[in-house]
Amino acid sequence: MILLRTERGRVEVFLVRRHRGASFMASSYVFPGGASEPNEDARTTAVRELFEEAGVLFAKDIGAVTETLQVASAGALRKKILAGNPAAETLKLSGLAFTPDVLVPWSHWITPSVEAKRFSARFFVAELPPGQEPQFDDSETVDQAWVTPREAIERAAELQLPPPQVRTCWELAEHATIAAILAAGRARGDEPHPIMPRLAPGDRPCLLLPWDPEYTTRGTGEGTPLTYRPSWARGPSRFVLEDRRWKHVEFPGSTTRG
């Protein structure tokens, strides 16, 4: 879940730090999110996980988006859900329901096929609701940060940002306002082209994205190349691991700002 706010005229993105004992991306700063529950669509998963991990509630009461007055009881609802009570039923008992439709699809990342542990992650973008402030759950997540997309990229090594977060921040940094980001997301459609990096052989880890010129000729593993070039598939097209940081770089011989 890509949660945004405007602070001092700058767009900032919200990150949470995963617990050091996590089985995947331990100690990394990531976007809030998690696994879907049975019969749960991706949007609902995103709003539920955001509420569980960060306490931000996208919900409605009698068709209206949650007001600040209603948010006052969100802490108690969150505790019930974290204690194991079904999220949708818990909200319903309080006269509320999640509003997943406010989320805008952004991207769909799939772990490279060469990895033993794999995920299919759909990223959505939304603006922080008025009157709410996120707070990490101190269980799965142990810290949090609001940073501009450009700051996130510059601090990628310190924050231990995984490639999907780095690439997403690169794309977000292309836009000056949240409105522009939301418009760009809507232009991508409800089913963005899946991004499954391929591993390139070499003396250091290198991941190729679907628009990289060597994605099909040099990359190993599965993954669907782009048969066309959408506007978002530009700039850096691969990741190289250097000094504990995934550096987002362009095909050799090209120039990039990322």
Give the positions of each predicted feature.
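Short beta-strand scaffold segments in enzyme catalytic cores
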Residues: 1-3
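Short acidic-glycine loop/turn motifs at beta-strand connectors
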Residues: 5-10, 202-204
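Conserved Nudix-box catalytic region and its N-terminal flanking loop in Nudix hydrolases
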Residues: 10-80, 151-160
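Terminal peptide-recognition signature
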Residues: 50, 124, 169
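Charged mid-protein connector segments
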Residues: 66-115
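Acidic, glycine-rich loop-and-strand cores that form catalytic or ligand-binding grooves
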Residues: 76-96, 162-187
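NUDIX/MutT-family hydrolases
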Residues: 90-109, 120-131, 135-159
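Core RNA-modification/binding signature centered on pseudouridine synthases
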Residues: 165, 172-258
